[in-house]
Amino acid sequence: MVVKFTKSEALHKEALEHIVGGVNSPSRSFKAVGGGAPVAMERGKGAYFWDVDGNKYIDYLAAYGPIITGHAHPHITKAITTAAENGVLYGTPTALEVKFAKMLKEAMPALDKVRFVNSGTEAVMTTIRVARAYTGRTKIMKFAGCYHGHSDLVLVAAGSGPSTLGTPDSAGVPQSIAQEVITVPFNNVETLKEALDKWGHEVAAILVEPIVGNFGIVEPKPGFLEKVNELVHEAGALVIYDEVITAFRFMYGGAQDLLGVTPDLTALGKVIGGGLPIGAYGGKKEIMEQVAPLGPAYQAGTMAGNPASMASGIACLEVLQQEGLYEKLDELGAMLEKGILEQAAKHNIDITLNRLKGALTVYFTTNTIEDYDAAQDTDGEMFGKFFKLMLQEGVNLAPSKYEAWFLTTEHTKEDIEYTIEAVGRAFAALADSK
């Protein structure tokens, strides 16, 4: 049976007339998987999507991570509805924002103080400003391939070597801004040390995805994050954890709790909103007191702390406090990993699979993936074919070889079993096309 996307194709054609590129985020485009009209979804419930053509999918996109409790979770939708009935925006303090801030602090002890914003991009952008205000320095460091939103300072690629300054990774980012950014490879202590030896006295902070989620799921090598803290603090700079993807995804207390390493500042987003727009940042009291109205680092937002997002976030965290929830995600993730690897061996398809608990990435390569260079050197064309074969099987993935598969609390063993069978059929088709 061939799945038809007639209405999605027509809708995309219309969208191209009104929306830039036909999408509101480039990651939704099918450009990276061979082109064509992206599938337009009409509704989601639990672990499933239905598109505008009526096709049903098991969803592993999970909105790029936030939908850990599945689509339209009743506890969360009830909280959002109640908040909406009471007014979606006040422009004043509320009891909800205080309650939610306390919940975040209890979950992540590194957060002495918290401030809400509207997105992960805003959260990261502001932690950089706060770090600069606190240290009096201007440069930042980041790891190659790690995505920290779309503000100018983080859209910077590596220069010609670890001891050179960055180059713009997007049109519209001035070279003068790129000169404030040093990019080094993830999981490589020596290049980090080399860069800090040269530039450390000018560095305000380093941005760290403690578990990488933006060139697939890549864990830090044992001792790497501890060494990052040591070297960066020796240079007088701060450590910022970008936990926009990782917080509440792998463990209730985030990657910093799972790995036992504490940053100075933390940026949050995605999961904490329960599906609504949100961001937050926090950290040590003496650093956060740089933020207005207490300090000179200005940050504000009309929509920040809005009642709907606060209510949704509180409800989401209440669901995530259920006993055994993360163990279930890990169990299902292990089952899916085992099945995919068995199907790859059966059909002689070369893959490397990285998994941590309820998230995984399938790379079409035989190489170990520990940094961005290795992730780049994988077969994107093969992934594009696999992606479209899986759509035909009723399995929805992110349209990029760099993205993760995210499990939700609503996936079942039957969903995993079907997915493994679908992977087998897709791998068989790929093997036949070689």
Curated annotation (Swiss-Prot):
InterPro entries: 4pyrrol_synth_GluAld_NH2Trfase, Aminotrans_3, Aminotrans_3_PPA_site, PyrdxlP-dep_Trfase, PyrdxlP-dep_Trfase_major, PyrdxlP-dep_Trfase_small
Required cofactor names: pyridoxal 5'-phosphate
UniProt pathway annotation: Porphyrin-containing compound metabolism; protoporphyrin-IX biosynthesis; 5-aminolevulinate from L-glutamyl-tRNA(Glu): step 2/2
Gene Ontology CC: cytoplasm
GO BP annotation list: protoporphyrinogen IX biosynthetic process
GO molecular-function term, one example from the UniProt record: pyridoxal phosphate binding
Reactions listed under catalytic activity: (S)-4-amino-5-oxopentanoate = 5-aminolevulinate
Main location (coarse class): cytoplasm
A Pfam family the protein falls into: Aminotran_3
Keyword line: Cytoplasm, Isomerase, Porphyrin biosynthesis, Pyridoxal phosphate
Modified sites of kind N6-(pyridoxal phosphate)lysine: 270
Localization, UniProt: Cytoplasm
SUPFAM superfamilies per the UniProt record, alphabetical: PLP-dependent transferases
Catalytic activity, EC: 5.4.3.8
Family: Belongs to the class-III pyridoxal-phosphate-dependent aminotransferase family. HemL subfamily.
Quaternary organization: Homodimer.
Protein name: Glutamate-1-semialdehyde 2,1-aminomutase 2
Organism name: Bacillus cereus (strain G9842)
Organism classification: Bacteria, Bacillati, Bacillota, Bacilli, Bacillales
Protein encoded by which gene: hemL2
